[in-house]
């Protein structure tokens, strides 16, 4: 066997008959499988041991030779080689076909490769191959055309006319094989190249296609006649197994049936040929053989599929590879693993951030080999078998050993669906009683887990390296930031938020107000003994607090705070300021001076003069976490998060907040507000009946009236709410619920959407406290049901989008430090109309500059060229009034097969510069796909019938962008740079004409009458600018402008969709995806290169080909950039393994085989498929050959011969 981690590339070609014979260990002559009495394989049958190897290890068929000592001997009685039974997975056989047979992939695929090679139509080929017509192979002196078809009758007539042997015509695959042998590739290619110089239209397209196929044959060294099979390989028997079921019946792979049919027909054909049977009978048998081989290779591709029992189509070789259940996706890309388990999850509020609770009975099973090794080492048992029995009996001593074994041995927890890399994280196991896995509450957000019955899977990394990687790269405590936007993903929620909110509340006039304490302990003691309330404002000596970054003017003073805030600040990292107010100024600049007593001031007066601060809400906690991370990185942050969690749980328990129906307030003036609205609606309807407004206007006015009524109720609700009301506290703190939920409980439910998406005029006037009437209930259930179905559909769509995104970008890896490009991307804030969707500051953070940035007024250099822009630097640049900056970007990176560190910038998940080997393509795909489920599914209708453009938004728009489809509601763009000189309306054709005057000429654009104009007369427009509202078609923009403009446009469009839904995604992720869509060019004129016109190729390969020609003084080729959708881009990737495992498996493999494609295994997917370590992170080639050195030699435990189990060797 080849060492799987050492080889460089993998090639696929057509197999020549001699190649197939060299693979084979013998010919399969009989259709038999196994003997029904002995259940042993039949001789010369499909499971023959002589051909494929023994069924039992080191044992021949007749039993003469048993045991390993006869290794390699061929038995003289039965002819079976004594070897491992595993060879039955790799030894192939063959069938000598008595008539040539065409390979259906090459004849039936689109485009038909056989047809293009011979310049015949697939229809004509089919007639010949399936014996419906003769084809003229050599007309000799007759006036017949070569390759022309003759029916049976015409053939007989021509024979009579010209005499026997005057010309050669045949039928069947044999005829095609003769024709293919006669193809002279070199002359044909030369002729086609000549023809291309003059050909146009359909002729040119066909010539380019033929040239492509012929050139592929010529360059790869494949011979066209190998598309016809004379010998059929038989795959190893263990890959088409036959197993005995409980009832004595057998279950066999469908392939055996298909092979049996081929063998039966082949043998019958051989017999007919021996008997010199009449031509028509032989012909019919040959046709049946052809159909049998077709069914074996791809059942159902031509005609009706061959069916098994219960009219189920049999699974052929092609079906074994295709689709989700095929070899690629089922077994190569998704394997099941041992040392894994799954269970329901429960909350583990006492765990540390890096821990998870594992039930004892799960742990003992998962860590069994480690425990057994330790039992033997401590001599509790003499050998492995005895140790195993100890574990199975549940001996008391194993639990102590288990405790030691799991110490510092991380496990991986995974929750499906794994939408991004935070769906699998590593934890240190803690043994617990019970049967549920315990999960730390703060990692729930990353997993999107809750405890309503979710299940999670647990995996054990076995090798030292795997454990080290789990600990260093995947430990949950390290994953504070979300890779998609660099914001903390572990913000506390629910009870934790509520507890800290309650803790930091302030209240006037509570017991103990105005007391002064010497230090924290005294204050807490007073609180515990009931002398002072948690929310009372008291004084404390500043000097008793540890270094909290006090200003010099604040030292040695008394500070006004509350006992709750003293406790809250006690868990903060020491170097954060004392947090008194929930705002960024206090967090970054220090505690405000107004809370400190000047000498001689009365504390009560100071307290009375201070306003009551609002408590710390979820958002404020998020800011504190982000600031902590910025200053202290992961270790301190995760410790702080644990303290925050414990404090929150403790105080939300102490607060004892409960919710009852009495907590829902009654709005005093609800009846008046609703009465007024009814009155207004009546007036609107009156006006409509009198013909003063259209039905559309009336509808809009009525719905607006009810909307305003609901808002008035909401406003009144907010005005009258009691800040100590538990529901209000939950809502205000961000623990659960929002104002809209609250107003449905206490105000009114408001307007509902009807099944057709239109908003109904009848609002639901009741709220949930009053209760809904039956009709109101009916109206509201519709919305709830629609929500459920939408979510279900959206999840599937979003998952498929993620799969396509991962596929197109999986080979984008950080390959080098700096690509040295001189290009950059000019960026400014992304705007949508007047609104800013993404500010310049956000776009600059974590990127490298391309040129130095100067202050627009003073000219001072703010930051040099090729420098990393930090968060503070970005703010400084924007504050200076800079509006656009040229940065290094993935779009302009010159690295082949990936990106360089400088063009990418920082890794958002760590906040540091990205490392070489980071798989940024996969991260980008996950970052864009994961929030997909949060996007809406709908197409918005603009109110009224005023416009006919529906703006696609949400998930459908994202798919439209990434698949480069023509958008709905397409905008008209100008191809001329100049001034809009006139917009004329033509009522007869219901269109408008826009005239743009440029330097070189005038552009005239016809626009639909109903389209909303974006430009006015006198506006200056650039090439590619939109004249009307709507989405620009990117392919059209590419024709008018350059690649960079298209890339910038697509980036802005993606950001608009996500940001409008409140989802933030780093620009660089979108850049990675968009760059993959534009990495190919189409060759227009080959010049002096040997490129073919019309071929798609990588920009880098195209540039290389041109460089060579220019150096030798030739004419370089010209090309045009091509924008491909992500599905097309995945299928056009240089790796045939990756493309074949994605979609259209047979088409990809057919094409790759003819071209003799080489896969250089640069991406992640192709390496996973062949079981090689992936070329990212520690798997990069540069780290591949490092051998771990053992520091202390470990004794190897030998094992008694008597046991049947292999010894477990200590790592």
Swiss-Prot record:
Mg(2+) binds at residues 450, 452, 454. Keywords: DNA-directed RNA polymerase, Magnesium, Metal-binding, Nucleotidyltransferase, Transcription, Transferase, Zinc. It holds the Pfam family RNA_pol_Rpb1_1. Its EC number is 2.7.7.6. Disulfide bonds: none annotated. GO terms for biological process: DNA-templated transcription. CDD domains: RNAP_beta'_C, RNAP_beta'_N. Binds 1 Mg(2+) ion per subunit. Binds 2 Zn(2+) ions per subunit. The RNAP catalytic core consists of 2 alpha, 1 beta, 1 beta' and 1 omega subunit. When a sigma factor is associated with the core the holoenzyme is formed, which can initiate transcription. DNA-dependent RNA polymerase catalyzes the transcription of DNA into RNA using the four ribonucleoside triphosphates as substrates. Belongs to the RNA polymerase beta' chain family. This is DNA-directed RNA polymerase subunit beta'. The gene is rpoC.
């Amino acid at each position: 066997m080849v060492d799987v981690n050492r080889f460089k590339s993998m090639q696929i070609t057509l197999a020549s008959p001699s190649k197939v014979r060299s693979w084979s260990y013998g010919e399969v002559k009989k259709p038999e499988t196994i003997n029904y009495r002995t259940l042993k394989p039949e001789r010369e049958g499909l499971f023959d041991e002589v051909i494929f190897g023994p069924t039992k290890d080191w044992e021949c068929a007749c039993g003469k030779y048993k045991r390993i000592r006869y290794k390699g001997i061929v038995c003289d009685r039965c002819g079976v080689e004594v070897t491992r039974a595993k060879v039955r997975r790799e030894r192939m056989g063959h069938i000598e076909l008595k008539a040539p047979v065409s390979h259906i992939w090459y004849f039936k695929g689109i485009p038909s490769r056989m047809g293009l090679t011979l310049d015949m139509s697939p229809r004509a080929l089919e007639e010949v191959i399936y014996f419906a017509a003769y084809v003229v192979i050599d007309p000799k002196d007759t006036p017949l055309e070569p390759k022309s078809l003759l029916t049976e009758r015409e053939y007989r007539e021509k024979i009579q006319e010209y005499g026997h042997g005057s010309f050669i015509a045949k039928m069947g695959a044999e005829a095609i094989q003769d024709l293919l042998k006669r193809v002279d590739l070199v002359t044909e290619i030369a002729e086609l190249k000549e023809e291309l110089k003059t050909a146009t239209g359909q002729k040119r397209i066909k010539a380019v296609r033929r040239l492509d196929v012929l050139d592929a044959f010529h360059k790869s060294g494949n011979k066209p006649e190998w598309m016809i099979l004379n010998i059929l390989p038989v795959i190893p028997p263990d890959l088409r197994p036959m197993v005995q079921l409980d009832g004595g019946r057998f279950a066999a792979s469908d392939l055996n049936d298909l092979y049996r049919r081929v063998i039966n027909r082949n043998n019958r054909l051989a017999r007919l040929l021996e008997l010199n049977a009449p031509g028509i009978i032989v012909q019919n048998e040959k046709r049946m053989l052809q159909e049998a081989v077709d069914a074996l290779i791809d059942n159902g591709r031509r005609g009706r599929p061959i069916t098994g029992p219960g009219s189920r189509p049999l699974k052929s070789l092609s079906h074994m590879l295709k689709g989700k259940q095929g070899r690629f996706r089922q077994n190569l890309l998704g394997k099941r693993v041992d040392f894994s388990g799954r269970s329901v999850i429960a909350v583990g509020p006492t765990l540390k951030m890096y821990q998870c609770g594992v039930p004892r009975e799960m742990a003992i099973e998962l860590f069994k080999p480690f425990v057994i090794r330790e039992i033997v080492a401590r001599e509790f048992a003499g050998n492995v078998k005895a140790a195993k029995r100890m574990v199975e009996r549940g001996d008391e001593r194993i639990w102590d050993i288990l405790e030691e074994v799991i110490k510092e041995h991380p496990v991986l927890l995974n929750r499906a669906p794994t939408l991004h890399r935070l769906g699998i994280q590593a934890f240190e196991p803690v043994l617990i009683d019970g049967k549920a896995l315990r999960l730390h509450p703060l990692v729930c957000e990353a997993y999107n887990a809750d405890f309503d019955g979710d299940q999670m899977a647990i995996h054990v990394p076995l090798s030292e390296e795997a454990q080290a990687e789990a600990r260093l790269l995947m430990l949950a405590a390290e994953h504070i930031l979300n890779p998609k936007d660099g914001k903390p993903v572990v913000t506390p929620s629910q009870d934790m938020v509520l507890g800290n909110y309650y803790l930091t509340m302030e209240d006037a006039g509570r017991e103990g107000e105005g007391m002064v304490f010497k230090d924290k302990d005294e204050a807490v003691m007073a609180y515990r003994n009931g002398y002072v309330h948690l929310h009372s404002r008291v004084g404390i000596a500043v000097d008793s607090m540890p270094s909290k970054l006090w200003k010099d003017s604040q030292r040695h003073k008394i500070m006004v705070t509350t006992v709750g805030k003293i406790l809250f600040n006690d868990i903060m990292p020491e170097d954060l300021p004392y947090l008194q107010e929930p705002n960024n100024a206090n967090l970054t600049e220090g505690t405000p001076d107004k809370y400190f007593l000047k000498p001689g001031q009365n504390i009560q007066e100071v307290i009375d003069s201070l306003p009551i601060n609002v408590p710390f809400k979820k958002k404020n906690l998020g800011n504190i976490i982000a600031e902590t991370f910025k200053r202290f990185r992961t270790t301190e942050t995760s410790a702080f998060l644990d303290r925050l969690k414990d404090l929150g749980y403790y105080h939300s328990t102490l607060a004892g907040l409960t919710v009852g129906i009495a907590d829902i307030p009654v709005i005093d003036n609800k009846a008046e507000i609703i009465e007024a609205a009814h009155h207004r609606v009546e007036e609107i309807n009156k006006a409509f009946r009198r013909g003063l407004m259209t039905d559309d206007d009336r509808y809009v006015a009525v719905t607006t009236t009810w909307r305003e009524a609901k808002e008035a109720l909401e406003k009144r609700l907010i005005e009258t709410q009691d800040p100590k009301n538990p529901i209000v506290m939950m809502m205000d703190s961000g623990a659960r619920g929002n104002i809209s939920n609250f107003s449905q409980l206490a105000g009114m439910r408001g307007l509902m959407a009807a099944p057709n998406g239109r908003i109904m005029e009848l609002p639901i006037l009741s709220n949930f406290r009053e209760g809904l009437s039956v009709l109101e209930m009916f109206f509201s259930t519709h919305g709830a049901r629609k929500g459920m179905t939408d979510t279900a559909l959206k999840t599937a769509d979003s998952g498929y989008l993620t799969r396509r995104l991962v596929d197109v970008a999986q080979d984008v890896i950080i390959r080098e430090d700096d690509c040295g490009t001189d290009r950059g991307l000019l960026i400014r804030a992304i705007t949508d109309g007047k609104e800013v969707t993404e500010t310049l500051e956000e776009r600059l953070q974590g990127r490298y500059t391309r040129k130095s940035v100067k202050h627009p007024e003073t000219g001072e250099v703010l930051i040099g060229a090729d420098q990393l822009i930090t968060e503070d630097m970005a703010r400084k640049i924007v504050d200076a009034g800079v509006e656009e900056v040229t940065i290094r970007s993935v779009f302009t990176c010159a690295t082949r097969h990936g990106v360089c560190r400088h063009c990418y910038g920082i890794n958002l998940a760590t906040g540091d510069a990205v490392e070489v080997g980071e798989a940024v393509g996969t991260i980008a795909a996950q970052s864009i796909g994961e929030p997909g489920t949060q996007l809406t599914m709908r197409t918005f209708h603009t109110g009224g019938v005023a416009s006919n453009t529906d703006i696609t938004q949400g998930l459908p728009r994202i798919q439209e962008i990434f698949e480069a489809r023509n958008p709905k509601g397409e905008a008209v763009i100008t191809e001329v740079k100049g001034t809009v000189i006139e917009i004329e309306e033509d009522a007869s054709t219901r269109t408008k004409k826009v005239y743009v005057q440029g330097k070189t000429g005038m552009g005239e654009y016809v626009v639909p009458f109903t389209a909303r104009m974006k430009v006015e007369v006198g506006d200056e427009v650039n090439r590619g600018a939109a004249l009307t509202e709507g989405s620009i078609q990117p392919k059209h923009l590419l024709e008018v402008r350059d690649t960079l403009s298209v890339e910038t446009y697509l980036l802005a469009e993606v950001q608009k969709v996500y940001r409008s839904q409140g989802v933030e995604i780093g620009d660089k992720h979108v850049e990675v995806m968009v760059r993959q869509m534009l990495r190919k060019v189409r060759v227009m004129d080959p010049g002096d290169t040997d490129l073919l016109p019309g071929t798609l190729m990588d920009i880098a390969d195209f540039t290389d080909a041109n460089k060579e020609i220019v150096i030798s003084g030739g004419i370089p080729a010209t090309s045009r950039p091509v924008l491909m959708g992500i599905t097309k881009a995945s299928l056009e990737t240089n790796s045939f393994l990756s493309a074949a495992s994605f979609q259209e498996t047979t088409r990809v493999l057919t094409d790759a085989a003819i071209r003799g494609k080489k896969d250089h295994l640069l991406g992640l997917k192709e390496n996973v498929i062949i079981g090689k370590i992936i070329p990212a992170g520690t798997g990069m080639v540069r780290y591949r050959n490092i051998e771990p050195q053992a520091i202390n030699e470990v004794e190897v435990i030998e094992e008694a011969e008597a046991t049947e189990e292999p010894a477990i060797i200590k790592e």
